């Protein structure tokens, strides 16, 4: 994608503030118009009550905030960020997530965290890519929201197979005991930040780790939730 500084990544119109990356019109257009469960983030009847799935088998987190489904126009930007090394996209995407978080806080009283957590990459994958996209989303969020963030708060204990090609059952098995907590979280309100949540296996494994170590609450914030 050819880009010009000061123009919106999506519509190519001039930006009021060049560092925003995505204009206000496109920012509003990217938000899903579907009613989503506030806990699992999947389509539901009500946006303020847990869905039937969560009532029967709740995920190991209390709240999920997402901007949109994993579909255009956001999916191509996320793909470029991760696989074309366009790390400059991250700040614009992080701002979209911030706007969604602030909207949830205004409308539902969403609790802001004490600390946000990146989803870690295995060392070799991090080296090959040159960055962790979750870190690039967390860094501006922590600054804007005045909360703590440490890229090494959770680390990977081993390499795992690429999740994209695995079933939900194999994803869960693939990630079993794949993470280690490096910082105390007792009594803290935590948020896990990721770019895309599909089955939720990765964030579920990290959420369980945080809760086992005494975290008061765990939320998941992501750019896209596969709906």
UniProtKB/Swiss-Prot annotation:
InterPro entries on file: ComF/GntX_DNA_util-trans (IPR051910), Competence_ComF (IPR005222), PRibTrfase_dom (IPR000836), PRTase-like (IPR029057)
Transmembrane segments: none
Record CDD domains: PRTases_typeI
Xref: Gene3D superfamilies: 3.40.50.2020
Family: Belongs to the ComF/GntX family.
NCBIfam families found in the cross-reference section: comF (TIGR00201), PRK11595.1 (NF008616)
Summary of the function given for this chain in its UniProt record: Could be involved in gluconate metabolism.
Protein name: DNA utilization protein YhgH
Phylogenetic placement of the source organism: Bacteria, Pseudomonadati, Pseudomonadota, Gammaproteobacteria, Enterobacterales
């Amino acid at each position: 994608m050819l880009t010009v500084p000061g123009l919106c990544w999506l519509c190519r119109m001039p930006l009021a503030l060049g560092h925003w990356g995505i204009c206000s019109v496109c920012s509003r257009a990217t938000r899903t118009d579907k009613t989503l469960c506030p806990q699992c983030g999947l389509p539901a009847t009500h946006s303020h009550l847990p869905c039937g799935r969560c009532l029967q088998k709740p995920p190991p987190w209390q709240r999920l905030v997402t901007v949109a489904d994993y579909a255009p126009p956001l999916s191509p930007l996320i793909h470029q960020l991760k696989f074309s090394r366009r790390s400059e996209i991250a700040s614009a995407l992080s701002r979209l997530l911030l706007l969604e978080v602030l909207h949830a806080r205004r409308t539902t009283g969403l609790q802001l965290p004490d600390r946000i957590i990146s989803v870690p990459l295995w060392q070799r994958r991090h080296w090959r890519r040159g960055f962790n996209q979750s870190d690039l989303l967390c860094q501006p969020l922590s600054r804007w929201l005045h909360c703590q963030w440490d890229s090494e708060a959770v680390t990977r204990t081993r390499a795992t197979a690429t999740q994209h090609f695995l079933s939900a059952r194999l994803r869960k098995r693939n990630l079993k005991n794949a993470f280690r907590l490096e910082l105390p979280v007792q009594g803290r309100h935590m948020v896990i930040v990721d770019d895309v949540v599909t089955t939720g296996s990765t964030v579920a494994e990290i959420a369980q780790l945080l809760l086992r170590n005494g975290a008061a609450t765990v939320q998941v914030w992501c750019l896209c939730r596969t709906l």
